Amino acid sequence: MLFHITHTHSHETCPAVHVDRRKTLDECWEALRTTPEIRVVEAYAAPLDHIFHITVEADDLAAVVKAMSPLNALGSAQTLPVMPLDDLLLLVGEGASRP
């Protein structure tokens, strides 16, 4: 299952600005990259907006929650299950969106 994570933090909690918070980011990123139940698909940062966009693949949400929880000390996150657009278009073509 694919999950898209959007993490947002403020300038006051930014790990790039506050060295003591950098350790939290490093530990969270390492957990995402090394947890066997999680595969990082893509990860991007919008540094001027203090936002991370991370897409991961995992069997369920529990492993993602465990790996991402430390980052909640720096800001907030939205985690959404997502699917490839090509897969959605196939479903729509099969009538999945019709009542």
Give the location of each predicted region.
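An amphipathic, aromatic/His-enriched active-site/gating alpha helix that lines ligand/cofactor pockets
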Residues: 35, 57-89
